[in-house]
Amino acid sequence: MAQPGKLLKEQKYDRQLRLWGDHGQEALESAHVCLINATATGTEILKNLVLPGIGSFTIIDGNQVSGEDAGNNFFLQRSSIGKSPENLLDNDPSFFCRFTVVVATQLPESTLLRLADVLWNSQIPLLICRTYGLVGYMRIIIKEHPVIESHPDNALEDLRLDKPFPELREHFQSYDLDHMEKKDHSHTPWIVIIAKYLAQWYSETNGRIPKTYKEKEDFRDLIRQGILKNENGAPEDEENFEEAIKNVNTALNTTQIPSSIEDIFNDDRCINITKQTPSFWILARALKEFVAKEGQGNLPVRGTIPDMIADSGKYIKLQNVYREKAKKDAAAVGNHVAKLLQSIGQAPESISEKELKLLCSNSAFLRVVRCRSLAEEYGLDTINKDEIISSMDNPDNEIVLYLMLRAVDRFHKQHGRYPGVSNYQVEEDIGKLKSCLTGFLQEYGLSVMVKDDYVHEFCRYGAAEPHTIAAFLGGAAAQEVIKIITKQFVIFNNTYIYSGMSQTSATFQL
């Protein structure tokens, strides 16, 4: 019987448990997130992380609370003005090593570069967030982020009808569609129907699978001919056959290893296994060895089938064929894991059965995201010019907003303030900001043109942090933090820019 506390938790987090499961929720509840600066953006991020149940937070804000802060931050009151909030920042850089993720909001460029360097060397993920007028900006800095459960949209079913394993082939052969009672005929799973007619198709086409549109239409006609006829010669209403006809494309997908998985297999981290190798790469190496041996060039069977029209008995039997094969494949991968762990002097239990099963059932969807460091992005010789210049084919591309943010940071470095922070400064700052933009583009060798309209607009922003933009960015940032912590779904790589002017967004690898 389930414990009352567990039931309460399931009721409280029902929706999100459907997204990332118990193990994802456990990761969130054991996470420790550091938020630097409780600005409007920071507060929105915090709110969106508190609600899903993040375990603990540390907020670092060394600034005095001002009237502007009280207006931006709904956690502060007017009575807070003039009082200094608790300073949780320890000057020792190792202070940051305790956190699962660090989120930095509204930090100046010089501070960001120092912080990013510390976290990069400690391999602590950093998410930079910034609201500047009607512009939202996020940058993820993480050396390596492996994802087992990427949850791809429109994932293809793993049915193996083009390469049936022996147990599946034997199961298909147990059906004789030509000598069935009407009830059994109309309750045969569509996977079996397609497999039976595929065998007939092979015999007529020298084993060639239907590939072209015409071939697939001919194959559908072949299935259609198998629908039972009544005494008047009219086709019976057999929904399972109609379901088979609709699922021809799904069923005839080629069983192959995705290129993204091949890239993982060919990665140095997968080839060279040491005692320091993370569990993901040990599992990936074991998977690679399984493919080369027991899998005969194929990944482990996923072990799931879609819902379909069939009687319970037939459906469960078919489901069990796939499930048993999935268990058998997972056990084979597990043997490779055990041998690898032994070879590097690691305990067999250092990789759990749960991790193993999770990897095998998601073996076609593994992802590894590697972001560039902030130092590389800001380096004169390492800046990604190609990404910027190619994006500037459209003069209103969101990359322009990135260039403007770099320009206002240069303005801040030169003048000790952001452009247009006071109304009387807006006009005089236009020329100064344009000069900063020109200097930045020349220094980095970026031969692109930015419209004067953007310079004027950024001066009018006055470094304001409108709550509408902060709220949007807070939700988006919290989503990325959750992805990082749960290691589920795929984070963007590596820069995200939102334009409140056009209500569009884009990602760039900078």
From Swiss-Prot:
It comes from Macaca fascicularis (Crab-eating macaque). It is found in: Cell membrane. Binding of TP53BP2 to the regulatory subunit NAE1 decreases neddylation activity. It holds the Pfam family ThiF. Pathway: Protein modification; protein neddylation. One of its GO terms (molecular function) is NEDD8 activating enzyme activity. This is NEDD8-activating enzyme E1 regulatory subunit. Regulatory subunit of the dimeric UBA3-NAE1 E1 enzyme. E1 activates NEDD8 by first adenylating its C-terminal glycine residue with ATP, thereafter linking this residue to the side chain of the catalytic cysteine, yielding a NEDD8-UBA3 thioester and free AMP. E1 finally transfers NEDD8 to the catalytic cysteine of UBE2M. Necessary for cell cycle progression through the S-M checkpoint. Overexpression of NAE1 causes apoptosis through deregulation of NEDD8 conjugation. The record marks 187 as: Interaction with UBA3. GO terms for biological process: apoptotic process; protein neddylation. The modification N6-acetyllysine is found at residues 6, 317. Belongs to the ubiquitin-activating E1 family. ULA1 subfamily. InterPro entries: APP-BP1, ThiF/MoeB/HesA, ThiF_NAD_FAD-bd, Ubiquitin-activating_enz. PANTHER family: NEDD8-ACTIVATING ENZYME E1 REGULATORY SUBUNIT, UBIQUITIN-ACTIVATING ENZYME E1. It comes from the Eukaryota. GO terms for cellular component: cytoplasm; plasma membrane.
